[in-house]
Amino acid sequence: MQNRVCHLFGIRYPIIQGGMVWCSGWRLASAVSNAGGLGLLGAGSMHPETLREHIRKCKAATDQPFGVNVPLMYPEIETLMEIIQEEGVKIVFTSAGNPKTWTSKLQQAGIKVAHVVSSSRFAMKCEEAGVDAIVAEGFEAGGHNGREETTTFCLIPAVKKVCSVPLIAAGGIVSGEGILAAEALGAEGVQMGTRFALTEESSAHFNFKDRCLRLNEGDTLLTLKQFSPTRLIKNDFYKLIEEAEQKGASADELKALLGKGRAKKGIFEGDLYEGELEIGQAASQLRQLQTVDEVMKELVEDYRTALRQMQDRQNW
């Protein structure tokens, strides 16, 4: 499974754990890195000094590469980036903003930079900004999404046609078969959020994990489209948002309704009714809470099995 993504980040398998809010602390990131993937800390739900603490704990827990995922719209972005550089982090994934703002600055500090996009148009802007890799995320993904609503199956080939840097697929991938499919479409690695959010090492509340592991197809939907498109589990909060949107609520009204701490309330504190429950469509394929080590071994084994089966079928 060695390729440009593996060489870029110094990892054994081209499997990246998404840096999700309220899920991706040092325990999860270090476990993924120790298992041969790339663990990412989710800075989007951390105060700057909390991030520093998680970076240091992650360093103590693994001698393998790990990184930090940073939403560029974060209000204390300057402080976060200072801490990342001060603590010697070598890999940063950015999202939700202009990649030109930070890419060259981080690279000058010896940091590899990947940026998350939801369209080929934004992917071209990333390549122009000089990023080291691009994460193309389809709208199957949990949490914040692009407005295009392009599926991963359609997005990866489109981005592959216009970009030459290593391409990482994200959105709806939770299995070894999914990894192989992403490679067939042109990706050289995958980023998985949902699969790792539902592990023992994830910092998400047990209530949240348990609910996600009992989902059926169609139990998550994209909402908040007038504000910031987000994939959520249908619950009381989701219904509140849907009613507001049907009545023509403005972006400001939706922002006020969202308020502060909805994601923390749902994902981290386990409020299944009033909280914001962000998870991807592919959660409906999962039924068992596993350790990261179990997940990684299963992904690699299933990938290799699927590859052999594919090769055996090549008779036409």
PLM segments and residue spans:
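Active-site entrance/lid segments in N-terminal catalytic domains of soluble metabolic enzymes
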Residues: 1-162
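Active-site metal-binding loops of divalent metal-dependent hydrolases
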Residues: 20, 172-173
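Conserved active-site-proximal phosphate/metal-binding subdomains
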Residues: 146-168, 174-316
